[in-house]
Amino acid sequence: MISKLTKIVATISDLRCEPEHIKDLHDAGVNVIRLNTAHQSHEDTIKVIDNVRKISNKIALMIDTKGPEVRTANIENPIIVKTGDKVIISTSPINEPNNFQTNYDGFVKEVPQGSKVLIDDGELEMTVVAKLPDRLICEIKNDGQIKNKKSINTPGISLKLQSVTEKDKGFIELAAKYNVDFIAHSFVRHSKDVQDVQEILTASGNPDVKIISKIENQEGIDNIEEIAKASYGIMVARGDMGVEIPAEDVPIAQLKITQTCIKYGIPVITATQMLHTMIENPRPTRAEVSDIANAILNGTDAIMLSGETAYGKYPIEAVKMMTSIAKKVEKHRKMTLYKDELFYDKSITRNYIIKCAIDATKLMDIKAIIVDSLKGKTARIMATYRASVPLFITTNSERLARELALSYGVYSNLVDNNFKRTTEFVVTSLKMLKEQGVVNDKDTVIIISGNPNRNIEKGTEFMEINTVEDAIKGRNI
């Protein structure tokens, strides 16, 4: 049975990746497993990939790159600072107190006087009060300490960092080699960043790995339209985003990004600290529950767990909680959130049929929508309407089934054969759904398909509304 329409992405590490644990996560509602390469080696990653595939060929895999970042460097002992103190960020070590460098050679050159500099995910704030050719002199704004290899953010400042690091390149090549489904690339600022990742995948012999662009700063937000056009999907990565832009601007950015993804018919993932309390506690805060609910009400395809499942004390409970919240919210949302003209281009038959099917779900008691989607495009566009009934595709492509694991309300059944005629597809699909207990003979379903000869790829061409029993009998096979 299908318990929810919203998809769940869960982060796991090699420290807790036994097949039994992965199965428990999957049974609790996880659709996609995420691997954070910031904390893993190639060997660790391969171990997790192998274990996931032992459990199910329908669980999608996502490798998350570390991306370009600036960190503190050459600090032997923590620098203790108080409000009003001065520190020096220099291009190379100098004989001055409170001095440190960064791992990015262009930092001093590219950061102007007056800029805000944040250390360790925003824990320490300083302002550049003077600039010399080889150093920035900064004034501390709050008490704290500066440790080695801590993150540095410069809100509103565009640094000329390379889009793909050597470490990223190695993991992208690994994703291509092991046929991973998604690459989530960090700190995407322009469509060119997406193209850079695609070039590595193509050169590695697997251009079909799908790219999820992580939006984490103002540049990415400003360029969301061009990034969405170039990407398979988008992740709203609210951790670094909440450091790079004012915290009160994050909900507005989240909504803008979600609406842009809906506009272009691509999946969107809402991420970071969704059930952060459950890393240490068995129950979430009311604010966390509301955060998840609002993400779903705003139209997200998927919601993500990070530390909650990677190293938290209650990983299965966190997934079950997320599933429970999703099920409840989905029952109380409007049938569809979006305008009637969404994807309503009458020159494209597919879009007209999709719109008719969505309208039918509002007026009739429809149990399920069965979509004959050879490449997934029709299913992804239908998902964008966020209908209140699940969409099912039957396919012999494991890759397609896993790609659709990110799309709202879309579920896949895998078969061995490649249907030659639509009749075979419909009958097989309905019989499988009956066996799974999703539908019974008297339930009404919508069937969407293309040319009766499935070898002729002409796209979506017809819609049928029928009971399961009559749809099978009418095909007489």
Curated annotation (Swiss-Prot):
Cofactor(s) demanded: Mg(2+); K(+)
GO MF entry, a single one: magnesium ion binding
EC top class, as a word: transferase
Annotated pathway: Carbohydrate degradation; glycolysis; pyruvate from D-glyceraldehyde 3-phosphate: step 5/5
One GO CC term on file: cytosol
Enzyme Commission number(s) from the entry: 2.7.1.40
Site (Transition state stabilizer): K214
Keywords, in A-Z order: ATP-binding, Glycolysis, Kinase, Magnesium, Metal-binding, Nucleotide-binding, Potassium, Pyruvate, Transferase
Subunit structure: Homotetramer.
UniProt name for this protein: Pyruvate kinase
